[in-house]
Amino acid sequence: MAQTITSLADLKQGPGAEPAGLSAEPQEPKLDKEGRAYATGKRKDAVARVWIKPGSGKIIVNGRDLGVYFARPVLRMMINQPFSIVARVDQYDVMCTVSGGGLSGQAGALRHGISKALTYYEPALRPALKAAGLLTRDPRVVERKKYGRAKARRSFQFSKR
């Protein structure tokens, strides 16, 4: 009998292939020897290396507590955003090292790294984090300074006479 073709993806696969988007087995979590998920997050010039494991919700940044390293509540809320979106608040311990950039960029890198590590630990959380835009690396960086100008776009003061 002829196989029914319902989409362009089915046509590309050829005969006897499994339909697109359907996998037989669920994805396995990517864990190290100690049972932690590792990921890196980036934002502007900041790079965060993140390890997560099940625990009480403690977050350690560069050997210091989250509240000590990030004093502004907005930054702490930004870092905890991945956990609140997938309803996993106070279920994972996070240990991370952050370098480069300023505090805002570091918080963004940390949020990106935590989101990626959560998807490695629980692959089922990926659609929710992807829909919230937390798995996408923010490509916005500082525009470079051009010669003949004061800054990236600001010109030197012009005098007619």
Swiss-Prot record:
Residues 27-38 have a biased composition (Basic and acidic residues). Keywords: Ribonucleoprotein, Ribosomal protein. This is Small ribosomal subunit protein uS9. NCBIfam families: PRK00132.1. GO terms for biological process: translation. Residues 1-38 are annotated as: Disordered. One of its GO terms (cellular component) is cytosolic small ribosomal subunit. It holds the Pfam family Ribosomal_S9. It comes from Rhodospirillum centenum (strain ATCC 51521 / SW). Belongs to the universal ribosomal protein uS9 family. One of its GO terms (molecular function) is structural constituent of ribosome. InterPro entries: Ribosomal_Su5_D2-typ_SF, Ribosomal_uS9, Ribosomal_uS9_bac/plastid, Ribosomal_uS9_CS, Ribsml_uS5_D2-typ_fold_subgr. PROSITE patterns: RIBOSOMAL_S9. It comes from the Bacteria.
